[in-house]
Amino acid sequence: FFDKATNYEEGIWETPEAQTCFDIVAKLAEYTNPITPAQANDQDFTQNQQLVLDNKAIFMPNGTWIVGEMADAPRADGFKWGMTALPAVKAGGDSYSYTWFEQAWIPSGAEHQDAAKLFISYLYSDKACEIFAKAGAIQPVLGIADKLEGDNVMFYSIYDNGAKAAMGNFASFEAIPGIEVRTVFFDPVNSLVSGDMTEQEWIDGIISASDQMRANLK
């Protein structure tokens, strides 16, 4: 479903799986802190993050960078960061945490391909993992959580505790006036929270835009 949805497959947004996703987001919108939409922009987003630090919101979707991003922000007494994967939709199902990998490429016409392959293999060595960890980057190596420190131990150990990694993104498409992934899928959630848009209006907009996205895939 994930791959089909992110490639705008015809009819995908009218499936039971898609409806479940829409219903979950709409339900979350019902008890999202009402001040969130006004601060959901590139200038004020840290104020929404501050709601968690102040114990005014119990959770938020975010990334491991949040600790550094809010390092100097005030917080409630005894506050500690926590993290969990997205809960399974059904009991006994899989839970997921979204992630992505940086990529290294070797051009097919490269002169020193063997040396390049050796270097890429080095990127996953114990020594390289130590270097990456000092910069706050984590290599996709089994057991890496055992070598981490501080909050990163908790963040990345969720995969060792059974969470699966969800990877991928919306497929790119040729520019379409007035249509972007963010404005179609994500920004309307602010209107769900404020009550200015219904769940069905959101769905209808996604279906309409996806038809155009699919027709303009790169």
Question: What residues fall within each predicted segment?
Answer:
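Periplasmic solute-binding protein
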Residues: F1-N7, Y98-P107, Y159-K164, E180-N190
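Glycine-centered hinge/linker elements that transmit conformational signals in sensory
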Residues: N7-A40, L86
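Short helix-initiation/N-cap motifs at beta->coil->alpha
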Residues: P37-L53
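Beta->alpha turn/N-cap motifs
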Residues: F45, N62-M70, E102
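Short, hydrophobic alpha-helical packing/hinge segments within bilobed ligand-binding/sensory domains
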Residues: Q47-V52, I66-E69, A116, C129
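Alpha-to-beta junction loops
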Residues: N48, L53-N62, F79
